[in-house]
């Protein structure tokens, strides 16, 4: 049995970018490398908006942000990956969820955190990155 808590790093969607895979947020990768060097496996979930939702949001900017509009690229510590529509069950296997959040991602990070707390109150969620650093009271 693994004595380490299961950790999931999360990159919330960048709904305001044309291509959400233009750049990588390096913080989670650095932390994953550090943990791996110390024998602690972790997975990475990259949430991104479906093309259909992007088209609808462009046509109607007032359309609310919905988690159901997301896909999830899950990269596991064993090297396997999956790319599927958002399913809240993704969080079931984890005890710690760590989000790296920049200000344009904050609304989605709050939605994700709310969903995690509603469905899985046992999970510890951590929000880091530039947004919480500068907007601590808001977070």
Where are these regions (language model features)?
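Glycine- and acidic-residue-enriched helix-capping/strand-helix junction motifs
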Residues: 16-28
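Charged, often glycine-rich, active-site loop that binds/positions anionic groups
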Residues: 51-80
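A short, Lys/Arg-enriched amphipathic alpha-helix followed by its capping loop at the start of a domain
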Residues: 31-40
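Residues that mark the start of a beta-strand
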Residues: 4-7, 41, 117
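Glycine-rich beta-alpha loop elements in corrinoid/cobalamin-binding modules
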Residues: 34, 44-51, 74-139
